[in-house]
Amino acid sequence: MRNTVCCLFLLIFSTNAFSVNSNLILADSFPDKLSEFEFFVDDSAQEPHEKVIPYELISTLFSDYSYKQRWVYVPNNAKASYVKDWVFDFPEGSALIKTFYYPVDERNPDLGKQLLETRLLLRKKD
């Protein structure tokens, strides 16, 4: 019995049992905590889930010397569509995620980040 429980435990934690909560993206209400979306496997370190992809902009806006990290989540291997002279058309359940932060010490990035704010842009049903 103990071996069965251990195997089940390993199976659960080695699969995508803990993945992005796509249903919450489409929900009418917003959750109490950002972590309920499960975009990050480690919220405090901003370590994204494997299906949350980092991206960078070619040209960024100045934001009071803060740094930004950006990620995109597109559900179920769906794809965004490109429309010339317009914005990308993301499928329902997609999310753009942006976190503002300052380094704890500019001279030593290994000391971590002071997280300031995380913003979400959620693609809901039309």
Regions found by a protein language model. Give the residues of each.
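Sec-dependent N-terminal signal peptides
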Residues: 4-13
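Sterically constrained small-residue positions within well-ordered secondary structures
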Residues: 10, 63, 109-111
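Bacterial Sec-dependent signal peptides at the C-terminal "C-region" and cleavage site
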Residues: 12-22
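N-terminal pre-domain segments of enzymes
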Residues: 20-70
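Sequence context of c-type cytochrome heme-c attachment sites
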Residues: 60, 77-79
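Extended surface/linker regions that mediate inter-domain or inter-protein docking
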Residues: 68-76, 83-126
